A protein has these predicted regions:
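Catalytic cores of extracellular degradative/oxidative enzymes
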Residues: 468-652, 656, 661-663, 684-686
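Beta-strand-rich domains and repeat architectures in extracellular enzymes and scaffolds
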Residues: 59-93
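Beta-strand-rich domain onsets/edges
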Residues: 349-366, 375
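Blade/loop signatures of beta-propeller domains
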Residues: 43-64, 82
Length: 865
């Protein structure tokens, strides 16, 4: 191998002085033109996989293959046992289990996964993902490496598996109406040889199921050796989970003759595989969600008791019997990233199958990327967006390949990254949070050579120097995804995204409690915190009816149960209320707030009250400290303005709800809260004190300072009885263009300022007359078309209120009080219709809390009169 060394200093986005950087600036402009004119895989439609009418992001992560995975995924044995086919780097590979040597078998413009080897060893069927819109079926001839397209339409296809004699292919499709059904179709020499047979059909459960929808799913077919029956996973007649394992004949609508062989709550991970004698199935399970991690189990195919084969404190996914039944190949995330592993069926020996070398079928080179802080010269962690010459994304083998909430494909780097890439021009964008200019650049990859790039990210500003420290209020470490995440990795990603405080939340997924083992009593920062970055481990309490909430600073124990209102469980009742649980958390010293409260731009009162139905109750009772934005949107302003208009000082905060062990999820810190701690600096208590005091602004990218007579958000300006004038000042900076500044007084827009020149910065100064008590806040917005590289629909930031008190008059609004009363009336109507109450006493207790909140708002109405 040869090395070519290049040192590139990238321009700041929006930099005005190009006289000394003409060559580099020209390179960047060329890069932008190329990105604008070349189709790039991985930019899905506005909704990922639109032909799938249910399932959502959880299903996309737990069931759909990663597109791509930087490490092996979805093993399938060759019939002679000499090779294991896997998905890796967007292609199908065959791996020698003795040496770890991997040979690329399939390649085209799509991301390939879910391989299944034909019984004669000549063909591998697999899925082909176009980057988030459809998933199709293809088949490759192992000897000639010629690819045949099997499907090409708007639907989703998954789980291809050859029949024991190779004459048929079973698979899952969203045909005809967007719901997941199993089909079988004859196949011969890599081509269809007849019409498909629908083994299942669309079927309604009769009502919406929590996280799993109204319509049944039929997934993961596995052939019985006789070729006349299938096992599959279906949630037909199942209220919770992705379904049971059922056994059914391979005939049209065989689902009508199905028998259940495994009855347990599952989460898309089962992946049953039948032994060569047809007597047993091996599968991945959390034992009805009793375990935190997925382990391997065996059970009779006729039904019976499961037997646990592994006892890991990590996950074991996608098990597949070897042809002789002596080994099980599976995917292990013991060391973080998914890796190929083997388990001896009789004896229990375990082997991690390292990929010793990748033999690509096309010319490849290596990119070595080194990143540093442009101001200090020190190495720094970053986020990397990469599009290779073939329009696809590639990630280093030691990095987790991710798809952001907006559909960008990225990886995080600690400061050095090494990735194999196809020959040609690679386009990169290197990002470090909101306070550094992104660096855009291109490089040429040459076959057999190493291209070394050193990139500096230059600071836009330093908010900490002004007393502002940022952190998302909603981060999850592990949540049943493919990665076995760690606190260290969470801190690394937060470094790459440049957030100062990392607020990790322990949470339930159905009956499982993820990350409970990292809770440390005492209510303080976690011991791995550093002077540069604080880690706080809190809890997300997740009742689907009232709305999910955060609890940070619990001094003694986690709040249990972790949810209410789960159908068919012993916690189906809506008692206790969020009010009750807030009070219990506050008794432990916690700061609490509603999370991912409201999405979109419409008033939640016109719909089903959004994701924080209990907000207006707890705002009135003083039991919630905060309400969270989890994406760019305006819907939350309707209820929050109603609260602020009656002096209820609930703090608006930002937390994206990143689930960072999922491969497709919002990025850590993509929606965050900036808190002003002043001279106290970066310290946990100071940050949460500032949060509760409202010294905060929310941002998906723009940076804001806003004062009224020198008072910052959360503070009060006192004026005499006759009122007076106040001086408003605003300062805005942004790594992406901003379009407008919106000034709001008591919930009404009083001025909108368009930013027309240097759209990366704005300043505003106004002198305004005030005659009554109220509040000001500032909103900043950009255009959706200019959001990149932010992981948000558009650039948005807004401050909490600066309060104005005229004389001794409180802030009051009869209109907002009436709005709040209508909200609670609607909430109570929904609660009255809930079927899971256990007793009249429980209902009366909760409804009395609703009535106490009504009394508060009625009092505001009287006060405003």
């Amino acid at each position: 191998m040869y090395s070519r060394i290049g040192r590139i200093r990238c321009p700041k986005w929006g930099h005005r002085d190009s006289s000394q950087r003409f060559g580099t600036m020209f390179l960047t402009l060329v890069c932008a033109a190329v990105l604008g004119s070349t189709p790039v895989l991985g930019q899905p439609s506005s909704r990922p996989y639109p032909s799938a009418r249910h399932g959502g992001n959880y299903m996309h992560n737990y069931y759909f293959p990663p597109a791509p995975s930087s490490t092996p995924w979805a093993p399938s044995w060759s019939p002679d046992g000499r090779w294991i086919a896997v998905a890796m780097n967007g292609s199908i590979w065959k791996v020698d289990p003795d040496t770890g040597l991997a040979h690329e078998i399939s390649y085209n413009k799509k991301y390939h996964s879910a391989p299944d080897w034909s019984p004669d060893g000549q063909w591998i069927a697999y899925t082909a993902d176009d980057g988030g819109t459809t998933i199709q079926l293809e088949v490759v001839n192992v000897n000639t490496q010629r690819v045949h397209t099997l499907t090409s339409d708007e639907f989703i296809y998954t789980d291809p598996v050859f029949s024991p004699d190779g004459s048929q292919l079973a698979y899952v499709s969203t045909k005809p109406n967007g719901h997941f059904n199993v089909y079988v179709r004859p196949i011969l020499n890599g081509q269809w040889a007849g019409d498909e047979i629908a083994i299942t059909k669309d079927n309604s459960f009769g009502r919406d199921r929590l996280y799993f929808g109204e319509w049944d799913m039929h997934l993961m077919p596995a052939w019985m050796p006789n070729g006349r029956e299938l096992l599959l996973v279906s949630n037909r007649d199942v209220p919770l989970g992705s379904g049971n394992v059922i056994r059914l004949p391979v005939i049209p609508l065989g689902i009508e003759e199905a028998e259940t062989v495994l009855d347990e709550q599952t989460l898309y991970r089962t992946r049953p595989d039948v032994s060569i004698d047809g007597k047993r199935l091996v599968y991945s399970s959390t034992s009805g969600t009793a375990d935190q991690f997925s382990n391997l189990y065996v059970q009779p195919t006729s039904g019976g008791e499961p037997y646990k084969m592994t006892f890991f404190n990590h996950d074991a996914f996608h098990p597949r019997w070897s042809p002789d039944g002596e080994w099980v190949a599976y995917v292990s995330n013991a060391n973080g990233l998914p890796q190929l592993a083997l388990l001896e069926t009789y004896g229990g020996a375990q082997r991690r199958l390292e990929i010793s070398d990748r033999r690509w079928k096309r010319p490849m080179g290596i990119l070595s990327l080194n990143t540093h802080d442009g101001a200090t010269g020190e190495a720094t962690a970053v986020r990397v967006h990469l599009t290779a010459s073939d329009g696809k994304f590639y990630a280093p083998t030691n990095a987790y390949a991710r798809v952001t909430g907006e559909g960008d494909r990225i990886f995080h780097s600690r400061g050095t990254a090494r990735v194999e890439l196809p020959v040609g021009t690679v386009n990169l964008t290197v990002v470090k949070g909101f306070e550094f200019w992104p660096a855009k650049l291109t490089a040429e990859i040459t076959a057999g050579e190493v291209t070394i790039l050193t990139v500096g990210v230059d600071p836009l500003t330093d908010m900490a120097a002004k007393g502002w420290y940022s952190g998302s209020t909603h981060v999850h470490m592990n949540y049943a995804g493919n990665l076995h995440n760690t606190l260290d990795n969470l801190m690394m990603m937060s470094d790459a995204e440049d957030q100062d405080i990392v607020n990790e939340q322990i949470a339930n997924k159905d009956n499982r409690i993820l990350d409970h083992h990292v809770f440390v009593p005492g209510g303080g920062a976690h011991p791995i915190s550093t002077p540069e970055r604080i880690l706080v481990v809190g809890q997300e309490y997740r009742p689907p009816f009232y709305g999910h909430v955060f609890m940070f600073g619990l001094e003694d124990h986690l709040i249990s149960p972790f949810t209410t209102g789960y159908e068919g469980t012993a916690i189906e009742s809506l008692y206790p209320s969020n009010t009750d649980m807030f009070l219990k958390a506050k008794a432990q010293g916690a700061t609490v707030g509603y999370v991912h409260a409201f999405f979109g731009n419409s008033d939640p009162l016109e719909g089903a009250l959004g994701g924080a139905k209990g907000f207006m109750v707890d705002a009135a009772l003083g039991t919630t400290d905060a309400v969270e934005w989890s994406g760019a949107g305006r819907a939350g302003f309707f209820p929050v303005y109603a609260a602020w208009n009656n002096g209820l000082r609930v703090t608006a905060v930002g937390g994206e709800d990143s689930i960072s062990n999922l491969h497709a999820s919002k990025l850590v810190g993509s929606v965050r809260t900036y808190i002003h701690t002043g001279e106290r600096g970066l310290e946990m208590d100071a940050w949460f004190d500032g949060l509760r005091a409202g010294h905060a602004f929310v941002s998906t990218g723009p940076l804001v300072e806003f004062t009224v007579d020198g008072a910052i958000p959360g503070e009060t300006v006192n004026l005499p009885e006759e009122g007076g004038t106040v001086e408003l000042r605003a300062w805005v900076r942004s790594i992406t263009p901003i379009e407008r500044l919106i000034l709001v007084w008591n919930g009404k827009v009083i001025e909108e300022v368009l930013v027309e020149e240097n759209r990366h910065e704005a300043e505003l100064s106004r002198t305004l007359s005030v005659s009554g008590s109220g509040w000001y806040h500032l909103r900043v917005e950009g255009r959706t078309s200019e959001r990149f590289p932010l992981d948000a629909d558009f650039a948005q930031a807004f401050t909490n209120p600066v309060w104005i008190t005229v004389g001794d008059h409180p802030v009051r609004s009869q209109e907002s009080a009436a709005y709040s009363l209508r909200w609670i009336d609607k909430l109570q109507g929904m609660a009255e219709a809930w079927p899971g109450w256990r007793s009249v006493r429980e209902r009366l207790h909760v409804f009395e809390q609703f009535e106490q909140a009504r009394k508060v708002y009625r009092g505001f109405t009287e006060g405003s009169q």
